[in-house]
């Protein structure tokens, strides 16, 4: 989505990562009802629009097995970049001289910083109960929602330096590419054309080398065949000369 001027915030990136982790772990999570708890103590308290999500049951052995799969980080990276695209964040995949693009930068960031141990710990933090306690008199609680899923994972990620490094890196990468394509649109086009031109030139050189190789092989085979014909012709000439001499 080149040319987008949208800025991706640290909070938004954290939510995207936590949502992606949750989605990747859904096979290990089942919903359980009846474990959430709301306690209201005191007089004159008013609660309006207070909701609780269903609690979660987590299979920790499933989580451990899942995060250690060879393609887990790759799938997670794909999920994150797809979520970035879905939220109208500039994901340009413009090419530089080294053929690196935004998605590659994000993948490398995740592989370096977002370890399977960290992911496993944050997903495991889903276990337990949601508790909302209101004490005292005259309290007003409105539009309170307890979320036990992406938000808990998000809070866990914000407490880890590695996760913060990942989130910061992805945010900066997205904003960097977004700024590049929006503020330097013609430079972006020029770079893309230049990259394509370089690829064409490389392909042309390869084709020329292949043609030269074919010519060299053809010349070698042709010369060899001609040399063999000359060698076969020499005895015939000699025999003809001898016959002529004998007749004379």
From Swiss-Prot:
Residues 221-248 are extracellular. GO terms for cellular component: host cell membrane; membrane; viral inner membrane; virion membrane. A lipid is attached at residue 2 (N-myristoyl glycine). Residues 2-199 are cytoplasmic. It comes from the Viruses. It is a single-pass type II membrane protein. Keywords: Capsid inner membrane protein, Host membrane, Lipoprotein, Membrane, Myristate, Signal-anchor, Transmembrane, Transmembrane helix, Virion. InterPro entries: Virion_mem_poxvirus_L1 (IPR003472). It holds the Pfam family L1R_F9L. It is found in: Host membrane; Virion membrane. The chain crosses the membrane at residues 200-220. Interacts with A151R. Belongs to the asfivirus E248R family. Essential for viral fusion with host endosomal membrane and core release. This is Inner membrane protein pE248R. It comes from African swine fever virus (isolate Warthog/Namibia/Wart80/1980) (ASFV).
